[in-house]
């Protein structure tokens, strides 16, 4: 049992050391405070040039970490991205509309060209339909006028009957 616990203990120890070393390197915890950097133990050679360069390096590190605290994204960049997305979508929409209009114009030309090849039968048919409807309407009006004259008693022996026959024949 003791032989099994040593590898498990080593694995757990390795895991914790990795987690703790990574958690100290995360920027989520913020830059190291100046109090922690300045509270170092002074060694014998505190006035050495190495200590001065080390302090300068720590100042550079603090400035770099402070700059990294700013958000990664920029608001103006997001606005430009939104403008770009809108422009591309709008251009695509205009392209689709122009393609649709072009297609409709081609279809319209095809239909109009087939009509222009043989316009006489189409015109004859429409004229015949109009004439038929107009004749039917005039006959209905003549019948209505005749019935009104009969019902109102205004019928004369010679006046309305010849007109009625003439209107029915038209």
Swiss-Prot record:
<feature type="modified residue" description="Phosphoserine">
    <location>
        <position position="76"/>
    </location>
</feature>
<keyword id="KW-0027">Amidation</keyword>
<dbReference type="InterPro" id="IPR000532">
    <property type="entry name" value="Glucagon_GIP_secretin_VIP"/>
</dbReference>
<comment type="similarity">
    <text>Belongs to the glucagon family.</text>
</comment>
<dbReference type="GO" id="GO:0007189">
    <property type="term" value="P:adenylate cyclase-activating G protein-coupled receptor signaling pathway"/>
</dbReference>
<feature type="signal peptide">
    <location>
        <begin position="1"/>
        <end position="21"/>
    </location>
</feature>
<dbReference type="GO" id="GO:0043267">
    <property type="term" value="P:negative regulation of potassium ion transport"/>
</dbReference>
<feature type="propeptide">
    <location>
        <begin position="156"/>
        <end position="170"/>
    </location>
</feature>
<dbReference type="GO" id="GO:0005102">
    <property type="term" value="F:signaling receptor binding"/>
</dbReference>
<dbReference type="GO" id="GO:0048255">
    <property type="term" value="P:mRNA stabilization"/>
</dbReference>
<feature type="modified residue" description="Asparagine amide">
    <location>
        <position position="152"/>
    </location>
</feature>
<dbReference type="GO" id="GO:0005184">
    <property type="term" value="F:neuropeptide hormone activity"/>
</dbReference>
<comment type="function">
    <text>PHM-27 and PHV-42 are two bioactive forms from proteolysis of the same precursor protein, that cause vasodilation. PHM-27 is a potent agonist of the calcitonin receptor CALCR, with similar efficacy as calcitonin.</text>
</comment>
<dbReference type="GO" id="GO:0043066">
    <property type="term" value="P:negative regulation of apoptotic process"/>
</dbReference>
<keyword id="KW-0165">Cleavage on pair of basic residues</keyword>
<feature type="propeptide">
    <location>
        <begin position="22"/>
        <end position="79"/>
    </location>
</feature>
<dbReference type="GO" id="GO:0048662">
    <property type="term" value="P:negative regulation of smooth muscle cell proliferation"/>
</dbReference>
<dbReference type="GO" id="GO:0043025">
    <property type="term" value="C:neuronal cell body"/>
</dbReference>
<keyword id="KW-0372">Hormone</keyword>
<dbReference type="GO" id="GO:0070459">
    <property type="term" value="P:prolactin secretion"/>
</dbReference>
<dbReference type="GO" id="GO:0048242">
    <property type="term" value="P:epinephrine secretion"/>
</dbReference>
<keyword id="KW-0964">Secreted</keyword>
<protein>
    <recommendedName>
        <fullName>VIP peptides</fullName>
    </recommendedName>
</protein>
<dbReference type="GO" id="GO:0009966">
    <property type="term" value="P:regulation of signal transduction"/>
</dbReference>
<dbReference type="Pfam" id="PF00123">
    <property type="entry name" value="Hormone_2"/>
</dbReference>
<dbReference type="GO" id="GO:0051428">
    <property type="term" value="F:peptide hormone receptor binding"/>
</dbReference>
<dbReference type="GO" id="GO:0007611">
    <property type="term" value="P:learning or memory"/>
</dbReference>
<dbReference type="InterPro" id="IPR046963">
    <property type="entry name" value="VIP/GHRH-like"/>
</dbReference>
<dbReference type="GO" id="GO:0060406">
    <property type="term" value="P:positive regulation of penile erection"/>
</dbReference>
<keyword id="KW-0732">Signal</keyword>
<dbReference type="GO" id="GO:0032880">
    <property type="term" value="P:regulation of protein localization"/>
</dbReference>
<dbReference type="GO" id="GO:0005615">
    <property type="term" value="C:extracellular space"/>
</dbReference>
<keyword id="KW-0597">Phosphoprotein</keyword>
<dbReference type="GO" id="GO:0031891">
    <property type="term" value="F:type 1 vasoactive intestinal polypeptide receptor binding"/>
</dbReference>
<keyword id="KW-0325">Glycoprotein</keyword>
<dbReference type="GO" id="GO:0043005">
    <property type="term" value="C:neuron projection"/>
</dbReference>
<feature type="modified residue" description="Isoleucine amide">
    <location>
        <position position="107"/>
    </location>
</feature>
<dbReference type="GO" id="GO:0045732">
    <property type="term" value="P:positive regulation of protein catabolic process"/>
</dbReference>
<dbReference type="GO" id="GO:0001938">
    <property type="term" value="P:positive regulation of endothelial cell proliferation"/>
</dbReference>
<dbReference type="GO" id="GO:0005179">
    <property type="term" value="F:hormone activity"/>
</dbReference>
<feature type="glycosylation site" description="N-linked (GlcNAc...) asparagine">
    <location>
        <position position="133"/>
    </location>
</feature>
<dbReference type="GO" id="GO:0031892">
    <property type="term" value="F:type 2 vasoactive intestinal polypeptide receptor binding"/>
</dbReference>
């Amino acid at each position: 049992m003791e032989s099994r616990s040593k590898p498990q203990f080593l694995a757990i120890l390795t895991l914790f050391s990795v987690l703790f070393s990574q958690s100290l390197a995360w920027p989520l915890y913020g830059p190291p405070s100046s109090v922690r950097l300045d509270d170092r133990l002074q060694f014998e050679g505190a006035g050495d040039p190495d200590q001065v360069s080390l302090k300068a390096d720590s100042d550079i590190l603090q400035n770099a970490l402070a700059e990294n605290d700013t958000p990664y994204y920029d608001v103006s960049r997001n606005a430009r991205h939104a403008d770009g997305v809108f422009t591309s979508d709008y251009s695509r929409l205009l392209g689709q509309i122009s393609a649709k209009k072009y297609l409709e114009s081609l279809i319209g030309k095809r239909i109009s060209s087939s009509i222009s090849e043989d316009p006489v039968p189409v015109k004859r048919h429409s004229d015949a339909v109009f004439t038929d409807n107009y004749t039917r309407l005039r006959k209905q009006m003549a019948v209505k006028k005749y019935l009104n004259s009969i019902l109102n008693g205004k019928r004369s022996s010679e006046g309305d009957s010849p007109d009625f026959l003439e209107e029915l024949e038209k």
